[in-house]
Amino acid sequence: MTFDTSAYVRLDTLQSLGTSASGASLATSTGDIFEVSCYGPGAFRLRVGPSTKPDYGLVVGRAKPCEVAQGEGGAWKFTAGETTLELAATPLRFRLLHRGAPVAGSITDEHFRGWTRLPSFGRVRQGGQWTAAFALASGEPVYGLGEKFGPLNKRGQLVHSWVVDALGVNTGLSYKNAPFAWSPGTGKGAWGVFVHTPATVTHGVGYPDWSHRSYVVHVDDEALDLFLFAADTPAGIIDLYTQLTGRPASVPMWGLGLWVSRAYYKTPEEAAEVAAKLRAHKIPCDVLTLDGRAAWKVETRVDFEWDPDRFPNPRAALAAIKAHDLRICVWEYPYVWVHSPLFADLASRGYLLTTADGDPYVFGWDTTPGTSPFGKVLTPLPESAIVDFTHPGAYVWWRDAHAALFADGVDVIKSDFGEQVPDDAVAFNGDDGRRLHNVYPLLYNQCVFEATAKFQRDRDVAPMVWGRAGWTGSQRYPIQWGGDPQSDWEGLAASIRGGLSWGMSGVPYHSSDIGGFYGSQQPSPELYLRWLQATVFSSHIRVHGIGEREPWAFGADTEAIARKWLAFRYRLIPYLQRVIAEAVATGMPVMRAMALAFPGNTLTRSYETQFMCGDALLVAPVIQPGGEVEVALPPGAWYDLISRQRFPGQRVLRYKAALDQFPVFGREGYALPMGFAVQHTGEIDPAKPLEQLWVFGRPTRPLQGLLQANIVEASDGTFAIGAAADVKVELFGDAAGIVVAKLTT
């Protein structure tokens, strides 16, 4: 993709049109109005161009007061807390300072005539497209931009923020995008940028065909609307971004257990048989999914009517599954088959996206031999209309259509797809498909999330969905899984990177299809186990794919190892709940890439498939056959959870893991609350959830909020451990002098 600079008008000169408590409006030489607003310490908004089209509520934060000062020659300064935004004119450019040091600024790549190679701020002469360019220091990494399956560091890449059914995890295409990126900076502070738009954004992140020393954004919308962030750390940037775009909601405890699924259970009797077998084989599990073709007639879906041939009595069928202490997840997508009775009904109400002529827009799936994703198991999907969630009536209708499903016994919805809005579709709110496309899955999942909140039987637990597509704001409606990975080792590695990249984009929850979704052959037992072991440490865990994915399908030895690691997963739930509480408060993900957890450490950040689970556990997934993996240990000291051996940090460790072992390390100074090995979360006693407290070396951090254990700081700066009589404290490392006090509960 080339960048035609001659097509752009550069913005320059800044003349005051007025100031306010939170910013200023400035006139430019092109006649465009450049508006600057403060959104609290560390966050500034730069907006130029008209704002006549829907913004879809992507931003929930509000402007806040800041100090505004006008200098000479059209210069301006805006200060909030420790962060200052400086603007200069001719040409228009910015500099962002944090604690007095510059952390980000406009492009410095100059043409030999003295102009910058690309506009620092510019628009296409005919309007409707904008660009902005920022300077990058040599070697400065950039992260985020949604769920991307390639390298986490986007430096050198041309990245498109465009939601698409990626049909796998092997390309730059992705189901979940967010035009939000950040850099740990060069030692003076971190910075971030969010492009506030539902439209397509192209990011040239040190892309050499444009400028290897610049980060260039190209926005296909009527206005350029940017938010700039500055903070001490990348965690601070994510905190600012999620303050602005919405904090993640919490999730129910049962959702942290195992989800079992396949494409697909042919009959409810087969699903009930699997449910019984899970209990007979002592496989811990909480949710069973009736996937795409398991509940509905393919020819009429989705009409919210059970297939009458297979589900003559749906409540009885679901009760047979739920009798095994399982929740039920049911698949849907936001499309209506053209021959369904619902099609004419919804069309007559204006509840469907239309063509320019006002007819319902009919979407056809690719059925071309050689390119179609469909086959013998996953048969072609029917031509369908697309529900228009911008229509208030359609939104309410779709939400309330779920009532009967939840009354029948459904607990949660797998809200699949949502990536298919065509550019030339027309929405009720006046937008075209080009602008609606990216935010459509956000509106769709919001609707299903609200349906769950309204109709679920457990009124005292948080609602959730199991969604695939997303955009900025999707963190408000958890959770999303990583789509359809290929069943091989590269599919595993890419799925891990996708989850970490989504987490670096301000979304704390992620899962993937253990074993992979598709492939020319079924996953090997080794691949299945390594995928499962890695996903034990993600926020959510599900086995799924075309064909059997239940542990017993891979042999008795594999089943035994899977059972062991699933038991460990359930024991982790008290810890995961603490990590999730932090996610809700700050936006930090459960799975934390090395560049996010240790942003200043150049050794570890290049290891892009290892991650922190919360702040206490280092996870180094095995992503190749044979069990060998290199582990880059961050600073400090680390305890192998298998051998209990202590390893000094800031080194690379070559690790060989037997099939029943997995490289996980506890961080010295931290503690790990461990629960019981149960068969489902309903067996967890909320008054006594802990069985053990694992302490890695001498504690250096407090642990509070648990009923049965704590670590508190004494007046002399040391930390004391307390535990109830029924909680065993496991001390890793030298325990000399460490005293454990008994708590009364």
Q: What are the language-model segments listed below?
A:
Residues T30-G31, E72-G73, T79-G81, T90, ...:
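Short, well-ordered loop/turn elements at secondary-structure boundaries
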Residues S51, G57, H281-A562, A597-P599:
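Aromatic- and carboxylate-enriched substrate-binding clefts and catalytic-loop regions
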Residues A89-P91, L173-Y175, K188, V219-D221, ...:
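Short, solvent-exposed loop/turn segments at the edges of secondary structure
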Residues G156-V159, S174-N177, A272, Y395, ...:
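Short, hydrophobic/amphipathic alpha-helical packing segments
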Residues L92, G185-G187, P198-T200, T233, ...:
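Short, glycine-/Ser/Thr-/acidic-enriched flexible segments
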Residues M1-T245, A249-G255, V260-A263, P268-A276, ...:
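N-terminal accessory segment at the very beginning of proteins
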Residues E450-F455, P463, G470-Q480, G491-A494, ...:
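Catalytic core of carbohydrate-active enzymes
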